[in-house]
Amino acid sequence: MTQTWPFLHNAQSFIQENWNASGFQKPTPVQEQAAQLIMDGKDVIAESPTGTGKTLAYALPVLERIKPEQKHPQAVILAPSRELVMQIFQVIQDWKAGSELRAASLIGGANVKKQVEKLKKHPHIIVGTPGRVFELIKAKKLKMHEVKTIVLDETDQLVLPEHRETMKQIIKTTLRDRQLLCFSATLKKETEDVLRELAQEPEVLKVQRSKAEAGKVKHQYLICDQRDKVKLLQKLSRLEGMQALVFVRDIGNLSVYAEKLAYHHVELGVLHSEAKKMERAKIIATFEDGEFPLLLATDIAARGLDIENLPYVIHADIPDEDGYVHRSGRTGRAGKEGNVLSLVTKLEESKLKKMAKKLGVELSEAVYAGGKLKTK
């Protein structure tokens, strides 16, 4: 494959070796399309579904462009949550193996003094949450004048009011000729408008999941009364091989579902945005080990969550279009098989069908009978 993907063919040996060791056969469409644009120094705004390899799409060219002999930060990657920052940081750590490049993670809630010590080791790449990165810039601990590239991961979240001004301030601390790379699973028009103001003549990439990949994720819905959704979740939890990330609308609903399911002796984990970092990590690790079938979460709590080979996503409460894309993208990642189940009332059925049609999702009705899930 190194011969047919120009970027990889021309990349430094450590990138080629790590690629060969990864077992990847070929780049995903977003990786292939973004690499050359980034190498050419262009600003990029990219939309590509969750699970299509967006992190590597920018990480590999960013690693390729770093000059190890220069001792200052050359790339800053911003992400909206601590979990996502740590995931991206791990990707950078894995793919810089065999090189002299150094990276540091800067997240809120962690010890500032330790982070300042990290910066004294002259990392080439910074991965961080906007609040903590800006705090260290203001404290003159993080120097931005030599930063050549800024990456905004999950851009749709970074332009929300709670992050937008901080993100803009961080970008303003760099020189005008810096490169801006924006990657997101969904790209609303207002998000794109904000980014166009910040970027310089950006190339806009909109990559769809291939038909073959999309076909590996089965989208189904089950009809029940609102009051029976807990009972249905209880039944689904007993399906063979059931391991599902169950999305609910808000923290109030989360508590209601969790209490009722626990009352019926359903083993589950609960992720809410107020959970402590260690507590979250423990719940996620236990779920990944298959200790319980259902992990309940709100959209905010699940930000940056990446569970490998997750077989099911369940929408206990119906989201909007962007929410459906983000949530459903947690299963069937990197071309693997997956299942998306929506629990809907008769009234919600038409809303779901309209949404599926707009998103180009093939949807079928299913029923739970005889301990199995059957297509109606």
UniProtKB/Swiss-Prot annotation:
EC annotation from Swiss-Prot or TrEMBL: 3.6.4.13
Reactions catalysed: ATP + H2O = ADP + phosphate + H(+)
GO biological process: response to cold; ribosome biogenesis
InterPro entries, per database record: DEAD/DEAH_box_helicase_dom, DEAD_box_RNA_helicases, Helicase_ATP-bd, Helicase_C-like, P-loop_NTPase
Binding-site positions, ATP: 48-55
Chain ranges of the Helicase C-terminal domain: 231-374
SMART domains, sorted: DEXDc, HELICc
Recorded family membership: Belongs to the DEAD box helicase family.
Any one GO molecular-function label of the UniProt entry: ATP hydrolysis activity
Name under which the protein is recorded: Probable ATP-dependent RNA helicase YfmL
Keywords: ATP-binding, Helicase, Hydrolase, Nucleotide-binding, Ribosome biogenesis, RNA-binding
Annotated transmembrane regions: none
Sequence motif DEAD box, location on chain: 153-156
Reported consequences of knocking out the gene: No visible effect at 37 degrees Celsius, decreased growth at 16 degrees Celsius. A quadruple disruption of all RNA helicases (cshA, cshB, deaD, yfmL) is not lethal at 37 degrees Celsius, although both 50S and 70S ribosomes are decreased, while growth stops at 16 degrees.
Organism: Bacillus subtilis (strain 168)
